[in-house]
């Protein structure tokens, strides 16, 4: 059976919490091999959409599919997910945690891979430190490494560079782009429009639980008379929300 052109499909998706509807009839697809931006102000439904896609939330209505079917725990070996909330074994050493997850994910040389990655992100001197001794940004780098270490076919990232300075943001964007160059499809949430400009092929802007704009970056700009993505964000969500 041939694989569908879209690795992610969201159809007629509706999500309600406590009687309040936060997602209203949302439809979009992520094409195989692209980098797709899921954009919106705080509370627009981005994270809820990802969690429903991964089976962490039950949609009120609609269908959310990965590779043409609902997500199951077994799909975790081909889907890498970096959540907004970072959760690691805080009392364990960095290298031990990375090696453990590498073994779970089928990485052939997990310890060697982990050390090479830690060198890349300037954390090799922290390899034998306990996770709890690391800053939040350092923990975020470690968790990104765990997420990508088995070359997932689909990489889902919820604000992967949040809180980083420009140098480290660029470093992480370079790493994410390298994963993409190896063949991964990437679905990412970000509030940094320069990342969207640099990385994303297409994007969707959510507002009030619905799609405000959807398409290639060029098409979205054209819809707003070719202003910048930052200007579009302010125009759509208002200066107070942005």
Report residues per predicted region.
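A short, surface-exposed alpha-helical micro-motif characterized by mixed small hydrophobic
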Residues: 196-198
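ABC ATPase "signature
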Residues: 214-215
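Conserved ABC ATPase "signature" region
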Residues: 99, 103, 109-126
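Conserved ABC transporter NBD signature motif
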Residues: 62-77
